[in-house]
Amino acid sequence: MASKKGNRIVIKLKSTESGHTYTTEKNRRNDPSRLELRKYDPIVRRHVLYRETK
């Protein structure tokens, strides 16, 4: 079988206030820079900024 090399890669989003992480996918072509999203952090129990890590 041929392997499929797509534009989607799996990334980790790490909280700026605690050690909590989310995993998600992003499209390399549409978002070449690092993602920053506001998501819910269950450790501090509020929405905080999450940044993409390697």
Curated annotation (Swiss-Prot):
The entry's keywords: Ribonucleoprotein, Ribosomal protein
Gene3D superfamilies tied to this protein: Ribosomal protein L33
Any single biological process term in GO: translation
Keyword Ribonucleoprotein carried by entry: yes
Pfam family, one: Ribosomal_L33
PANTHER family with a match to the protein in the record: 54S RIBOSOMAL PROTEIN L39, MITOCHONDRIAL, LARGE RIBOSOMAL SUBUNIT PROTEIN BL33M
The protein's name in its UniProt record: Large ribosomal subunit protein bL33
Source organism (scientific name): Chloroflexus aurantiacus (strain ATCC 29366 / DSM 635 / J-10-fl)
